[in-house]
Structure formats: structure tokens, C-alpha cells
From Swiss-Prot:
PANTHER family linked to this entry: AMINO-ACID ACETYLTRANSFERASE (PTHR30602), AMINO-ACID ACETYLTRANSFERASE NAGS1, CHLOROPLASTIC-RELATED (PTHR30602:SF12)
Native source organism of the sequence: Pseudomonas putida (strain GB-1)
Entries under Pfam families matching the protein: AA_kinase (PF00696), Acetyltransf_1 (PF00583)
Protein name from the UniProt record: Amino-acid acetyltransferase
Sequence similarity: Belongs to the acetyltransferase family. ArgA subfamily.
């Protein structure tokens, strides 16, 4: 089977889930200048064609720096924010205006060069962001540097209803006609909050948030962000992480940080279960719970490959339906990714741990240990004092977790009578 067929099958639930959702996408000026920009635009057009309501916010910092250099002007910053005097504002307006036109042209060109040629794509922009001056902070006058005061929610929603891609630039206007230079991260965050967006997608140079060892942090709650912000200091990753957390605190369900340098990073994040960047969300990513009858299909999908390999004893749908109350599961985004069952053994104070399975894509996240702890806790609550497990392939895993080798003679009579000598499973036990 071609790989793309398998990918499409796995992506189809996300295609359906994302339709008619509102995504705010923030692309910094560095991302627009990157060689991968064309691929990002193509992916945005693809999202639009799949029914996603798109608001694209672009940055312009390197483009402004270039204009300043051309005019022999020195950029000035305080606390990471540009000080925008009159001469700098002229450069900002020039850079932002040219960049907005270039992005609109690229979006138009991309659809003409794609299989969607002939379909109509409209890009809409305008005075959709009202701003106010930052003013004087710590004795420093920021002049024409501003902050978002209000986003025209009704105006943007109407444009999205008309199937336009809304393009927001890092400029804001005051009721008195002044123009202010804004941070694109601020524009994107406020737009996502005020629109009640389903997602805020933030592009950065890295694959996502990297920890102190350079490893990707895949998931975070907003309340877990503070230590990372302290570690990152003024690093741009910190700005992205702060924006992602603020959006979630403001009601946006999920914020994502992905790489503008990696081809396909946006689609990987949106259409695969594991994603490719960093997800910040108030939602619980995974839940460990008791199984219900609705989980039978997911359990079969999880354990069938292991049954075919002889690792697990075969269980029919009917058996699972009858024994579903014995199972605990780990659910992630509607998918059962791990399970385990506890069977009390008749006429004894012992139980059997059975059918412990974890999806291969999630085997290094401690989910097996989490399920084992849950099964042991359930066993204690039931008054059991010994836990048996029969295994053919994972003996060392259980021994590392306190299970000792045992034998058929140690099994309670009700279980010993059912022992399959042909399968010849190794028997281990653990005192609770």
C-alpha cells in the first residue's frame, strides 16, 4: 500500500475536525524570508481549501532592519521592544506595506500553480486592528510603538464567512488617525482571543520549544510555562511560548509552536496524532480511566497486532464486551493508546494483571508504569494482596518493577486449572 494512502486514512479524522474551525497563524518576518516560505504558503492554501477559516498575521522585523540600514538609521530597543520614532515609523510603514503586498501576491501565485487552479482565493486586509501608544516606560519614550487595543472581531468574522483569508499586518490605527508599530505576536494573540479561535499557530526557527538539553518539549499546560520563560530570558522562543500561554489563558483551546524552516511542519502538527512541534493547552492531553463499552473497538485495534504476534492471548469482540469492566485504558484525543486488565481470581485474595499493551508510537512515555500503578491500586481497593502476571515476551519489564518469578503451583486453583501449557507463559507474582 502506498504511504500516502495510509497517511490519508490517519489524517481523515483531523480533516473533518478542522473544517469550519478558525486558526490564527503567526509568521515572523524571518519566516517570510526563509526558503521554505513558499511551502508554508502552499500548506496555508491547502488548509483554506479544506474549510479552515484562516487569519494570517505576519511580522516584519528583518525587513524593517533592512530599511533602517538603507537609510543609515540605527535601530533602538528597550526591554526587547523597538523604539519607533518618526524616521523609524517611515521605515516600518514601507517595510510592512511591501511585505503585505508580497504575501498577497504569493498566495495568489500559489493557487494558480496548484491543482486548485481555477478556484477563487481572496485575501482581505484593512484597518482591522485598533492600537494605542505604549507611551513612556522607565523613562523611555516609545513614540510610535503601540499595543493592541481592540481587534475588529465582527469585521474579521464577516470576511471569514465570505471565505477570505484575512491578512493582519503589525500595524495598528488609533481613532485619531495615528499609526502604531505593533509586535506581530501581540497582534496574533489578541486576534486569537477576541475571535475565539480554535487554534493559535506560531512559527519559529526551532521545531518547537526546546528544553535545556535541546530536546523538544511536546506538550505543556499554561501553568507549566513559567520555568521555561525564566530559563529562556529574552530568547525569541520565550516570546513565542509566552504568546501561546497567554492565548490559552484567554480562552483559545490550543496553541502550537512549529518551525518555519521545516517543510511540512504545519501539516505534521495538524494532521498527525503525535504532531511535530510544541502544543500548549488547558485541555488534558491524555486521561487514564476505566474502560467502557464504547472502547471495545479501540481496544481491538490496539491489541490485535500483539495477538497476531503471539504476545497477547486472543480476545474476541464478544469477550471484550463481556469483560470490559476489568479494563483500564489511556485515552489520547479519542484514541485508546494503552490498556491493562485486572481479573480477581476466584476463592483467593489474588488477582491477575493481563492484556497490558501500549501503542508502539507511545511506548517511551511511562504509560505502562502508569497503568501498572492503577491496576495495583485497584487490586488493593478490592482487598487483594497478590498480583500475578503471565507473559511470554516481557519478563524483564515485570521483574524490573518488583515482580518475582513464580510457578503454576503458586497460582490459586481457579487460575492454575486454566493454565495453557502449550503457550508456556512465564509466571510472576508481586505482593501488594
Amino acid at each position: 500500500m502506498p504511504d500516502y494512502v495510509n497517511w490519508l486514512r490517519h489524517a481523515s479524522p483531523y480533516i473533518n475536525a478542522h473544517r469550519d474551525c478558525t486558526f490564527v497563524v503567526m509568521l515572523p518576518g524571518d519566516g517570510v524570508e526563509h526558503p521554505n516560505f513558499g511551502n508554508i504558503v502552499h500548506d496555508l492554501v491547502l488548509l483554506h481549501s479544506l474549510g479552515v477559516r484562516l487569519v494570517l498575521v505576519h511580522g516584519s522585523r528583518p525587513q524593517i532592519e533592512s530599511r533602517l540600514a538603507d537609510r543609515g538609521l540605527t535601530p533602538h530597543y528597550h526591554r526587547g521592544m523597538r523604539i519607533t520614532d518618526a524616521a523609524t515609523l517611515d521605515c516600518v510603514i514601507d517595510a510592512v506595506g511591501a511585505l503585505r503586498l508580497a504575501i498577497e501576491a504569493r498566495l495568489s501565485m500559489d493557487i494558480a500553480a496548484s491543482p486548485m487552479q481555477g478556484s477563487r482565493l481572496r485575501v482581505a486586509s484593512g484597518n482591522l486592528v485598533t492600537a494605542r501608544p505604549i507611551g513612556v516606560l522607565e523613562g523611555v519614550d516609545y513614540h510610535h510603538t503601540g499595543e493592541v487595543r481592540r481587534v475588529d472581531r465582527k469585521g474579521i468574522s464577516r470576511l471569514l464567512d465570505e471565505r477570505s483569508i484575512v491578512l493582519l499586518s503589525p500595524l495598528g490605527y488609533s481613532p485619531t488617525g495615528e499609526i502604531f508599530n505593533l509586535a506581530c505576536e501581540d497582534v496574533a494573540t489578541r486576534a486569537a482571543i477576541e475571535l475565539g479561535a480554535d487554534k493559535l499557530l506560531l512559527f519559529g526557527a526551532e521545531p518547537g520549544l526546546l528544553d535545556a538539553d535541546g530536546k523538544l518539549v511536546r506538550e505543556l499546560r499554561p501553568q507549566q510555562v513559567a520555568p521555561h520563560l525564566q530559563r529562556l530570558g529574552s530568547d525569541y522562543q520565550g516570546e513565542l511560548l509566552d504568546a501561546a500561554a497567554e492565548a490559552c489563558k484567554g480562552g483559545v483551546a490550543r496553541s502550537h509552536i512549529v518551525s518555519y524552516a521545516e517543510d511540512g511542519a504545519l501539516l505534521t502538527e495538524l494532521f498527525t496524532r503525535g504532531g511535530g512541534g510544541t502544543l500548549v493547552s488547558q485541555e488534558q492531553f491524555e486521561v487514564v480511566r476505566e474502560a467502557s463499552i464504547e472502547d471495545v473497538g479501540g481496544l481491538l485495534e490496539l491489541i490485535s497486532p500483539l495477538e497476531e504476534q503471539g504476545i497477547l492471548v486472543r480476545r474476541s469482540r464478544e469477550v471484550l464486551e463481556r469483560e470490559i469492566e476489568q479494563f483500564s485504558v489511556v485515552e489520547r484525543e479519542g484514541m485508546i493508546i494503552a490498556c491493562a486488565a485486572l481479573y480477581p481470581i476466584a476463592d483467593s485474595e489474588a488477582g491477575e494483571l493481563a492484556c497490558l499493551a501500549v501503542n508502539p508510537e507511545y511506548r517511551h512515555g511511562g504509560r505502562g508504569d502508569e497503568l501498572l500503578e492503577r491496576i495495583e491500586s485497584r487490586a488493593r481497593q478490592m482487598g487483594l494482596n497478590t498480583l500475578f502476571v503471565l507473559t511470554t515476551r516481557t519478563a524483564h519489564w515485570f521483574r524490573e518493577r518488583g515482580f518475582a518469578p513464580s510457578g503454576v503451583e503458586r497460582l490459586p486453583a481457579a487460575r492454575a486449572s486454566l493454565y495453557n501449557y502449550q503457550r508456556n507463559s512465564k509466571i510472576f507474582e508481586k505482593a501488594l
